[in-house]
Amino acid sequence: MTVFSLRKHTAVDFVRGGEHILLADTALMADESTVDYSLKGAWSKRNLSFHPQVIGFDDDYTNNYLSKKSNLISFNGMLLALWDDAYQFSDSLNYRLPVDFLLVREKQKPDVQSVVNGYDVKMLIVDGSVPRYLAEKWINQAKAIGLPYYNIGDGAMEVGCTFK
């Protein structure tokens, strides 16, 4: 899984062997120069197709190694949750959903406490679509409670997987 370092856009590539599925916003896919420069270069280095299957943030999708339902994505044993305008956690649940990664995207008001009230998060990822001043607030709040984090503004994040 690769979370690309892109300004104003979100792109997560789920790679298995020579196949890959790209989770991306429609604005990114319409931005040919960003796709050519930022995505195709990475795909070329990994000998991946320049034409992956693309799924949107509002789409549900399932195949033999990836499942996306609403804001949750299961990829070969890892669980990723999205935190954006469309998806946040319901306060009505009486348990914390365990997730490996929680990806904050778009202009979300920094509220790490709400995140940890709803999710048992191993790592918070602050995406490049989050404005810099908000990203700094998310990171400072994560530091304050000892929550591991990664700021995509520092570069792409690649997580290896062991395929079973």
Task: Indicate where each model-derived feature is located.
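Hydrophobic alpha-helical transmembrane segments in integral membrane proteins
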Residues: M1-A11, G17
